[in-house]
């Protein structure tokens, strides 16, 4: 059984006037992509995600509970209205199916290569003929989708970062694309710490794109009723820089 990370709020911390004070709030699933380490063992949800969800829970009084799943399954559950999908890009295809929150923060899309076989990216033409590993079921910004299958091809059958990096190490793909709020050097150091292998990983200096990290909710879901509450909380956290301060703290962390 998957471990659930409960993000709850004591009644004394509820916002003034909250209708949830003094009672147990209904659980709201926050669906995130699961990950495993280099040996295939499940990894806990990243501190950045748990921290952001915790801030939202504290700011709204909602009982937000993180549920890690393979990304394709997380999307299917969200489409069925069974939770909030964390981190899905607002592509035209998804906009027909989901409503989206205001941006939580920004994340860049970085290319990772073996240090022994780097590539340069300044324009999309630099990726002509390349095979790029993306997250299973991943969809991205307009430019990426325009070049997908034309300038370059994608491989999206590997579900975890560890399995994607394994494909990269044996030459099945030319690069792995990862989303992160970190800069290139910081992400590179983290990957080499978490996924040490025969060689080192290099992150290409220029990102493919930078997009907002959003929460998505199916248009047919009753969870649309909490979207205004979440957006108001996101506005308050933006003014207080609560999320930004949390991410900055993660950038200075000494552990992986």
Model-predicted segments: where are they?
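Short coil/turn segments
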Residues: 33-37, 42-46, 90-91, 115-118, ...
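Short helices/loops that flank or line small-molecule/ion binding pockets
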Residues: 59, 68, 72-83, 99, ...
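Bacterial N-terminal signal peptides
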Residues: 7-16
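Extended ligand-binding regions for polar small-molecule ligands
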Residues: 47-59, 125-131, 212-247
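Periplasmic-binding protein-like
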Residues: 32-35, 107-110, 193-231, 252-256
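Extracytoplasmic small-molecule ligand-binding "clamshell" domains
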Residues: 21-97, 240, 249-250
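Ligand-binding cleft/hinge of the Venus flytrap
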Residues: 51-60, 102-103, 137-159, 165, ...
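Acidic, polar ligand-binding/catalytic clefts
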Residues: 66-126, 137-140, 205-208
């Amino acid at each position: 059984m998957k471990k659930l990370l409960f993000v709850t709020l004591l009644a004394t911390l509820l916002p003034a006037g909250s209708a949830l004070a003094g009672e147990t709030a209904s659980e709201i699933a926050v669906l995130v992509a699961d990950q495993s380490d280099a040996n295939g063992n499940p990894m806990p949800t990243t501190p950045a995600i748990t921290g952001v969800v915790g801030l939202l829970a504290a700011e709204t009084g909602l009982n937000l509970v993180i549920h890690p799943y393979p990304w394709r399954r997380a999307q299917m559950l969200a489409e069925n209205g069974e939770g909030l999908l964390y981190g899905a890009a607002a592509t035209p295809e998804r906009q027909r199916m989901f409503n989206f929150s205001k941006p939580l923060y920004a994340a860049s899309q970085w290319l990772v290569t073996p240090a022994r076989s780097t590539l340069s990216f300044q324009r999309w033409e630099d990726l002509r003929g390349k095979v790029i590993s993306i997250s299973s079921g991943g969809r991205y910004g307009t430019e990426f989708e325009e070049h997908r299958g034309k300038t370059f091809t994608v491989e999206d059958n590997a579900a975890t970062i560890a399995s994607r990096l394994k494909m990269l190490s044996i030459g099945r793909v030319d690069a792995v694309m990862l989303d992160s709020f970190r800069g290139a050097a910081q992400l590179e150091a983290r990957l080499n710490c978490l996924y040490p292998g025969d060689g080192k990983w290099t992150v290409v200096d220029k990102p493919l794109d930078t997009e907002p990290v959003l929460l998505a909710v199916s248009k047919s879901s009753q969870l649309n009723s909490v979207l205004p509450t979440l957006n108001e909380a996101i506005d308050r956290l933006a003014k207080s820089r609560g999320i930004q301060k949390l991410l900055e703290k993660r950038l200075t962390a000494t552990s992986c």
